[in-house]
Amino acid sequence: MSCSGRSLMVVGTSSHVGKTLLVTALCRILKKAGKRVAPFKAQNMSLNAYVTPDGKEIAYAQALQAWAAGIPPAVEMNPILLKPQGNLTSQIVLNGVAVGTYRAGEYYERWFAPAWQAVKEALARLQKQYDWILCEGAGSPAEVNLKHRDLANMRVALHLGSPTWLVADIDRGGALAHVVGTLQLLEPEERALIRGIVINKFRGSRELLQPGLDWLENYTGIPVVGVLPWVDWVLPQEDSMGIAANPLLWEDRRDRAGGQALREGRLEIAVVRLPQVANFSDFDPLLAEPTVHLRWVHPGQSLGSPDVVILPGSKTTLNDLFALQKTGLAEQLRQYSGHIVGICGGLQMLGETIADPEGWEGIAGTYSGLGFLPLTTVLQPTKVTQQVQTQSRWPALAPIQGYEIHQGSTQADPSGCLPLFDRENLGWRDPTGRIWGSYLHGLFDNHLWRRQWLNWLRRQKGWDPLPELEGHYAQQREQLLERLADLWQPHLDLGLLME
């Protein structure tokens, strides 16, 4: 069955070729052209998540695309979210609600039919509201061993009868071969939908590339509709594999050019690269701060001497805590005299105990935390997903927006720690402020609070404070989205979308 609305499908020759960023750019380009446009990804596998205004959980990438389109994120934009937990298992989030944890085979056996129904219903609702649906695929559409259960790629395009663009990453090498091979592995009815080829991450002379593009168009009969320049600045990665593929993601280019001298006068913040790190988009506002040097530290590495260490969110808090203990990083943290921060799962690790009475993360039991704050956490099957508005009590009074995504409740001993916010059970600190943690994702997005905290750190070092900022990181994100659209629009043939 084919739906009636207008759509464009974007698939790729492999993962991390730039599908997400292209759909993001197209959302902003069409918005600027006065179109009502919505993003869509049937199934996303990611630990970077966001909570919609009605408390539904979707991939952060689709939230970013919604912001690019100038609309609020909605669960219809990502009806299926798979959150890997290790050992070939994932938590399944269907229509924004967690429905259980399954191995891959179990998931497809039990949930394939209801998941595909959810995809069709989500598309139907979006088509009633928007002029254009920009659909993003996942991985490659040509995985022949997975095609019978592929919910995210050409099954969506065929359902919509959607013209489709195929994206290849030329920076990896072999882009033309990847395009040709992908096309050969598609079924004839799928290949007939491919209306354009996009070459992404191009660096160099277009004149030198042109003979290859001419050959590709002649060989495939499909036009090249875009050659997109390399983007040398950061928008949020879709998942942690993007970080693994690009270990320099957080290495400030000024540092690589100028070395240690240029880091003087900047706070150094080390974020622990947990095995199941989640919601690392929390730290994009810190990355944008010119007076902050942000870096990853892996379990097993030397911690060094940063000003702050952050334990980020985790999909499997206990397993990541065990990784810190086994690799010696937990002991390094105990010997460390700087500031320690925990976000969500990182907050739970900072406490004295974490109980898993029903074995949701493995073997049932109660386990010792890092012991930095007098907190006790009990992991529970019920998942908290909600947006939050509150006010901070420390380091100064400031309005706060953010969102919670966690399974577990935490209780604090008020004789040994203080609340961070007016809202209860959202975050705590020790009496000195050296160690604190919060369940709140998006905390650093709050300009005023972030600058207050950074200035509190700077005063500890005898440095001058930074100017305080009003507003929210969303304003900087808007500038990045505008910049992306302006950069790529001249390099795309948008005739199909502007008709």
UniProtKB/Swiss-Prot annotation:
It comes from the Bacteria. GO terms for molecular function: ABC-type vitamin B12 transporter activity; ATP hydrolysis activity. One of its GO terms (biological process) is cobalamin biosynthetic process. Residues 266-449 form the GATase cobBQ-type domain. The keyword Protease does not apply. SUPFAM superfamilies: Class I glutamine amidotransferase-like, P-loop containing nucleoside triphosphate hydrolases. Keywords: Cobalamin biosynthesis, Glutamine amidotransferase. The active site is at C344 (nucleophile), H441. Pathway: Cofactor biosynthesis; adenosylcobalamin biosynthesis. Pfam families: CbiA (PF01656), GATase_3 (PF07685). Catalyzes amidations at positions B, D, E, and G on adenosylcobyrinic A,C-diamide. NH(2) groups are provided by glutamine, and one molecule of ATP is hydrogenolyzed for each amidation. Belongs to the CobB/CobQ family. CobQ subfamily. This is Cobyric acid synthase.
